[in-house]
Amino acid sequence: MIEQDICPFCKLFDDQVGAEYSTTEAGKRAPLRRVDLKGEWPEDLKGIRRDQLTPSFILVDDGKEIGRLRGYPGRDEFWELLQKLLDKKDSQ
């Protein structure tokens, strides 16, 4: 997850999903890693394009991008879109 302190939708994600994320099946399959938009881009993500929209959720497998969700559409739609990304990962 690419985030920044001044992002109201990052806070909304935290309020609506953040606490339960790691306890869900999807959260276990795609652990949430937080990267600050203004911070240094992690070395192991150098091959992944940075995003300027926060929050952005990038699903990475073996150093390759599977897909990304740009923005936070709300709790229910977030889970649906994340599941589509996980299904895409499974089909590769």
Tell where the protein language model's regions lie, with residue ranges:
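Typically the conserved alpha-helix immediately C-terminal to a functionally engaged Cys/Sec
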Residues: C10-A26
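A short, hydrophobic beta-strand/beta-hairpin element that forms part of a small beta-sheet core
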Residues: L53-L69
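Thiol-/selenol-based redox modules, centered on thioredoxin-like
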Residues: P73-Q92
